[in-house]
Amino acid sequence: MSLSSGGWTPTPGFTPDQSAALPTHYGASQSQLGCQTVLMSVRVSVCHSGIRPLCLPGAGDESLRLQLSMDPGKSGEFRLSLQDSSGTGRSVTIAEFDLGTVNYEVKSPKCHELSLVAPPHDRISFNFRCEQEAQEWATVVLSSLREAQRVAPQDNGPQRPLDGLNLQNTMILQRTEETCIELTRAIEAGDMQAASAFAATLARQHATLKIQPSAGEYEDTEISLAVVVEDSSSSCCVTVKVFPHMTTAALKQQMFLEYGFHPRVQRWVIGQCLCTDQRSLASYGVHQDGDTAFLYLLSARHARLTLQVLQQDQESALLLSSPSLSLPTPPLPATSANGPSSLDQRPYTTLPPRLHTSSSTERRNISEIKDLINLEMPQLNEALSPNTASTQGWSCPSCTYINKPTRPGCEICSTNRPENYIIPGGYRPDQLELRRIQQEKEAIRQYQQAREEERRENFARLVMMDSQDLLPNPEPVDCRICYMDLQPGEGVLLRECLHCFCRECLRSVIMLSEEPEVSCPYRDDTYSCACSLQEREIRALVPAEEYERWLQRGLSVAESRCEGSYHCATPDCLGWCVYEDTVNVFHCPVCRKHNCLICKSIHEGMNCKQYQDDLAARAINDSAARRTTQLLKTLVQSGEAMHCPQCGIIVQKRDGCDWLRCTVCHTEICWVTRGPRWGPKGPGDTSGGCRCNVNNQKCHPKCQNCH
C-alpha cells in the first residue's frame, strides 16, 4: 500500500525484505517508471504533520527526493512521489500523490508545504537546499498543478452518450451559430432589414455574443509605438512594436511579457482617452510610426495584486509564449474599465496535453520544457537588460530615448540634440527620415514665407499710420483731463507716449502753453509724463493763426537762448540773426532794412563813425534820455533792480517769491543771489546756478522760494 491523495492505494512491486522494513500501518512501493515520464526531481528534507507517521527506518535527509512525473498517454495525469535511495541502490517510493487533488503552497524561498484536500488533511513540509532549486521546483509543480486541476473535471469518468437534453442544447447552439453567420453576412451586405431580423432572433434567445470588427479592416503593418511609462515617482520612454488591430488587452499582455508590468497595474491613455481592453489601438488613432501612448502604473496594493498571483501569471505567460509549446496564448484575467478584476479564477495551459510515445521525440520535448523552466524569467531579463547592440543615433539627455542622427530635437520630450553630437559621415537616412527632413524644410519655408508676409503687412500698416497727422484711439478710454468717455476714434493717441486725450483738451493745452515744447499733460500720483507733442500733431489740432503764433513763440525763445543772436532794430520787426565773424551787416528778411552789426543800429546813408558821433550829440541835448538812464542806474545801485546775467537788460522784482524770468532771453533768475537759477544745461541742472535745495540747503538765508 502507498499513501495517495485522500487515502491508501495499492502499489505493486515490493520485495518481502522491503515490506518487512516498513511499519504495519504504512506501505512503501518501488517507483514504477515504465509508463511514467519524470519531469523533475530534487533533494529535500521532510517534516510531517498528521495522524500517521511518515518515515522509513534508516533513511536520512540526504537520501530523500521529490519526483514529479506524468503519463504521456493521459492528459493532465501528474504524480508527485517521495523517493528514498539510501543503502539499497534502488529508489523506493515512500509516498505517492495524485497532483490533481492536493494543495501545494510556497511558505518561504526554501520551504514548501503539501496538504491533502480530503480528510484527514495531512500536511508535509519540504525543505530545499538552495533557493534557486526551490524556485525551479515551484514553477514546475504549480504549473502542473493548475493543468491537473483544469483537466480533472473532464476525466471524472467515461463519456456517456448524449441524452435528450444535451441533444437539444446542441441543436440550439447550432441555430445560434448559423444566425450569427447570417447576421455577419447581412451587415457586410448592408441589408438593414435582414440584419435587424437576425439581431432580434439572437436577442430573443438571450445569446451571449462577442462582436468586433474583422482584422481585415485594419492595416496589417507592424509599427513602432512610442510609450511614455510613468508611475508616482519616475518616468521613462520605450518603443514597442505593435499592430493597429491589436486590442488594449493584447498590448497589456505584450508589455507584461516584455517588461514585467502586470495587466492589473497598467492604465493606458492614447489621444487623451482612457483605453478599454476591448477596443483596438487603431480606434484611438494609432496608425503610423511615432504615434505616442502613455502608460501609467499603479501600485500593487491599489491594483489588489499579490506576489503569488504575479509569479503565477509570469510563469504562465512565459510558458505560453514559448514557441516550443505551440499552444494558443489564453488571456490573463479580464479587467473591467481598465482596472483589476475581482475574479481570481483564470484559465491556465502549461504543459502539452499529450506527448508522443516515440522516445526520441519525448526526450526532445522534455528537454525543451526543462530548459524553458530552468531559465529565470528569460523574456523579462532580455527586455530589461541594456541593449548592447550599436545603434546609430543620439540618446536624449532627459528621457534617454534613442533618436535618429539627423533629428534636431527629441521625438518624445522635444529636448534639443546635444551640441557635441556629430552626425556620422556615412549615415544614410531611411525613407521615413527623408520624409521628415523634407517636411521640416517645407515647414521652415512656409514659416519664413508667412513671416515675410506678416512683415510686409506690418510695414504697410505703419506707413499708413505715419501718413496721418493724428492717430485715433483704437479702443474706448477716458480723457485724463475732462474725464469724458471716448469711443474708438473720438480721441487722439499721442505718438511719443501713447497717452490718449480728447481734441479739445489737447487744443487748450497747446494754446495755454508758454513754452515752445508742449509737454504731454498726463499726471497721476506717482508719474508725470516727460514726452512732448510732435509738430504735426500741434498743426492738426489748432487753427492756422494759433499754429503761426506757436511757431513765432518758438523762434523768440530760440533767439533769446542763442548767445550770438541780434534782433532787427526796426520797431515791431520780428527778424533776427546770428553773429558771424566775417559779417558786419544784417539784411532783415522781414522789414528789408540793413542793420549794422557793429553799431547795432540802422544808419543807412552814414558809416559807423558818422552814426556814433551823431548819437553822442543827440544824447547831450536829450534831457529825457538822460533822466531815464539815471533812474535805471539808481534802481540797480539800491537793489531794487538788477542786470540779467544772460543778456544784461535791467529786470525788476515787483512782489512774490524770489523766482523771476527775463522777458528777453527767458533765463530763470534767483533774485536773492542775483544769479541764474540753473546751470548751463538749463532747468534741472544743479551743477551751477544758485543750487537751492541741494542737500536740503537753501541757496541764501533770506531765500523766499526761488524754485
Swiss-Prot record:
Zinc finger (RING-type): 479-529, 644-673
Protein keywords: Metal-binding, Repeat, Transferase, Ubl conjugation pathway, Zinc, Zinc-finger
Catalytic residues in the record: 657
Binding site for Zn(2+) 5: 644, 647, 662, 665
Amino acids binding Zn(2+) 2: 497, 499, 520, 529
Reaction equation(s) it catalyzes: [E2 ubiquitin-conjugating enzyme]-S-ubiquitinyl-L-cysteine + [acceptor protein]-L-lysine = [E2 ubiquitin-conjugating enzyme]-L-cysteine + [acceptor protein]-N(6)-ubiquitinyl-L-lysine
Compositionally biased residues, Polar residues: 338-348
Pathway: Protein modification; protein ubiquitination
Binding site for Zn(2+) 4: 596, 599, 603, 608
GO biological process, one term: protein linear polyubiquitination
Ubiquitin-like domain segment(s): 223-286
Entry EC no(s): 2.3.2.31
Residues annotated to bind Zn(2+) 3: 568, 573, 588, 591
Residues that hold Zn(2+) 1 according to the record: 479, 482, 502, 505
Segments forming RanBP2-type zinc fingers: 390-419
Alphabetical list of Gene3D superfamilies matching this protein: Phosphatidylinositol 3-kinase Catalytic Subunit, Chain A, domain 1, Pleckstrin-homology domain (PH domain)/Phosphotyrosine-binding domain (PTB), Zinc/RING finger domain, C3HC4 (zinc finger), Zn-finger domain of Sec23/24
Group of enzyme by EC: transferase
Zinc finger residue extent: IBR-type: 548-608
Gene Ontology CC terms, in alphabetical order: LUBAC complex
Domain of life: Eukaryota
Region named TRIAD supradomain: 475-703
Region called Disordered, residue ranges: 1-22, 329-363
Function per UniProt: Component of the LUBAC complex which conjugates linear ('Met-1'-linked) polyubiquitin chains to substrates and plays a key role in NF-kappa-B activation and regulation of inflammation. LUBAC conjugates linear polyubiquitin to ikbkg and RIPK1 and is involved in activation of the canonical NF-kappa-B and the JNK signaling pathways. Linear ubiquitination mediated by the LUBAC complex interferes with TNF-induced cell death and thereby prevents inflammation.
Family named by the database record: Belongs to the RBR family.
Subunit structure: Component of the LUBAC complex (linear ubiquitin chain assembly complex).
Protein name: RanBP-type and C3HC4-type zinc finger-containing protein 1
Species of origin: Dicentrarchus labrax
